[in-house]
Amino acid sequence: MPRYEIRVNGIPRLVDTLDPNQPLLYALRFLGLTSVKYGCGLGQCGACTVIVDKKAVRSCMMPISSVESKPVTTLEGLGSADKPHPLQAAFIKGQVPQCGYCTSGMIMTAAVLLAETKKPTEAEVRAALDGNLCRCGTYGRVLRAVMVASGQGT
């Protein structure tokens, strides 16, 4: 059985799979990383978004074989309970989630935006998050939280 070594949240992990095209999403869930959600399986909803090599990617569409030797970051690796990432802190303070299903994907996508653009405009935030769907409609709170995390809101 083929074995893939992937570096998840800074830790090398081994994944055994018969299928090199197995989506990264399934491997991450198998490793116990439950922030990564299965939404549509087509890369259209953003619930499965993770950071691979400093880019926001849909893990349901990325074969496990394509991430070998590339750093993968999930929400669990972005911050911790005692030292949350500014986006995590802003989402908590702003009471952004309702059901929470989209939260991980929203935060991971926004984290890449803030790493590339320290003070994004509202239009840039909206453009970056386009394609991350929220069935509860918390888009306004998400936008405010991202602006707060970038130091541009209260």
Outline where the language-model segments fall.
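Signature of N-terminal electron-transfer/Fe-S-associated modules in redox systems
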Residues: 1-154
